[in-house]
From Swiss-Prot:
Keyword Transmembrane: yes
GO terms for biological process, alphabetical: adaptive immune response; natural killer cell mediated immunity; negative regulation of natural killer cell mediated cytotoxicity; negative regulation of T cell mediated cytotoxicity; positive regulation of natural killer cell mediated cytotoxicity; regulation of natural killer cell activation; stimulatory C-type lectin receptor signaling pathway
Entry membrane topology: Single-pass type II membrane protein
Gene responsible for this protein: Klrd1
InterPro entries per UniProt: C-type_lectin-like (IPR001304), C-type_lectin-like/link_sf (IPR016186), CTDL_fold (IPR016187), NKG2/CD94_NK_receptors (IPR050919), NKR-like_CTLD (IPR033992)
Protein name: Natural killer cells antigen CD94
Biological classification of the source: Eukaryota, Metazoa, Chordata, Craniata, Vertebrata
Length: 179
């Protein structure tokens, strides 16, 4: 009788151990699948950005931002004053566009719209300045040297710049590094 009790307990222990092993393997498979699904869902898809985004190997931009040459651009559809445009860009952890070269905007088709960029005239320094306080390179827009206090710069469809009152309302372009 004692032998049959021991045999029963052994048999139940073996069955219980096999069930535990099966449950641990199942749990491991579920955890691996869960992490794989989370990684896929958290990776932004190139189709979540605006329709004319160029796919770049090093750009991952938020929805409604355009990726180009490892930068992200927000091209507004609404019009605001220069200051309100600057404030909007700042709220998005970006700044009004400060182009590094004339070619930087060549990938966009501007049609007939003017866009604020990050340049304004500082009466205090008697110079055109970027939003960050630096002086623009003379090579960037050599044709532009107009002195107009209380004016800011718009980028035009003809791929040139002009000065307008900062209170005028225009569309705007924000720029930031990719996520």
């Amino acid at each position: 009788m004692a032998v049959s009790r021991i045999t029963r307990w052994r048999l139940m222990s073996v069955i219980f151990g096999i069930k535990c092993l099966f449950l641990m393997v199942t749990l491991g498979v579920l955890l691996i699948n869960s992490f794989t699904i989370q990684n896929i869902q958290s990776t932004p898809s190139p189709t979540t950005t605006v329709e004319f985004q160029e796919v770049s190997e090093c750009c991952v931009c938020l929805d409604k931002w355009v990726g180009h040459q490892c930068n992200c651009y927000f091209i507004s559809k609404e019009e605001k004053s220069w200051k309100r445009s600057r404030d909007f860009c700042a709220s998005q952890n970006s700044s009004l566009l400060q182009p590094q070269s004339r070619n930087e905007l060549s990938f966009m088709n501007f049609s007939q719209t003017f866009f604020w960029i990050g340049m304004h005239y500082s009466e205090k320094r008697n110079a055109w300045l970027w939003e960050d306080g630096t002086v623009p390179s003379k090579d960037l827009f050599p044709e532009f040297s107009v002195i107009r206090p209380e004016h800011c710069i718009v980028y035009s469809p003809s791929k040139s710049v002009s000065a307008e009152s900062c209170e005028n309302k225009n569309r705007y372009i924000c720029k930031k590094l990719p996520i």
